[in-house]
Amino acid sequence: MPPSVTVFSSHPLLGVTIERRGEDQDDVHMHPAGQGVWVARMAAELGSHPILCGFIGGETGTVLRPLLDTLDAELRLVRTDASAGTYVVDRRSGEREMVATAWSEPPSRHEIDDLFSVTVAAALESEVLVVCGGVPQDALPLEIYGNLVADARAGGTKTIVDLSPPGLNKALEGGADFIKLSNWQLGQFLEADATEPENIRNGARRVLEAGAGCVMVTRGGDPALIMTADKTWELIPPKFTAGAAEGSGDSMVGALAAALAQGKGIEDAVRWGGAAGATNFLRHGLGTGSRDVVSDLLPRVELREVEG
């Protein structure tokens, strides 16, 4: 059995995409979607065994469940009375235009307890737990994030957190091993500007002081900043002119999780993350990419140590 990565993704989504097939005809595609789904997909592609934990229910859940079954992942889903969330994207113009959304209703207290216990049990069987946000963001009580991280770490499982505040703040209380966030999420955490390099460095230190073992701050097309208590790096992936950035961060997290689960150190893991994010960009896909392409791009990812 490959090393396991548990992915906490409270609300997997049904994604519907409209694309132009020809001059007078369209294509409509349905696929499993959401941050956790995309993380799990890349983790599986890079040789890990993902365990996806989340809710499923309602009419859209009936459509979504067989699509989730196509993932190379173990599913540990909790039934809920609420329908799974759905979005519709129109790509006929060449751009990704969101035209409709219908998010899930908040789960009950008992359903939340069921998902929490299922996730902790899975995490204790795994090398890594990834904690992702749900849609809507306020669907769960915030303390669940810190409790998941604390219980997983107490059992010897590494933890990766990809959340916006205030969920991020609660996860930090649990002592997360690795925090991945964008510079705008860092700005939310700081309640201050996080666009200038010095502000980002100072903000990353604040995240470490709040309980993280390592923090990565992505900055769109600029190099990402990675910081631990004693080292700081810039991650510079290859740049390409044509592609789509949606899902690149989730591909990066999936690769990070797979690498850490397989025993790689932080430096190797973040380089794998950079290569996976670049691969996702080339494919216009959310959490997609082949292991061969990621491996081919890996030598082109630069990790440069800088002053903290």
Regions found by a protein language model. Give the residues of each.
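Conserved N-terminal subdomain of the carbohydrate kinase-like
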Residues: 22, 26, 45-128, 296-308
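Conserved phosphate-binding/catalytic region of the ribokinase-like
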Residues: 169, 197-308
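Conserved phosphate/ATP/ADP-binding segment of small-molecule kinases
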Residues: 143-232
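Short catalytic helix/loop segments, enriched in acidic residues and glycine
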Residues: 19-39
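Short beta-strand scaffold segments in enzyme catalytic cores
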Residues: 41, 86-90, 223-226
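Short beta-strands and strand-loop turn motifs
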Residues: 99-100, 126-134, 162, 180-183
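Positively charged, low-complexity intrinsically disordered leader regions
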Residues: 1-22
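Alpha-helix C-terminal capping segments
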Residues: 40-49, 258-263
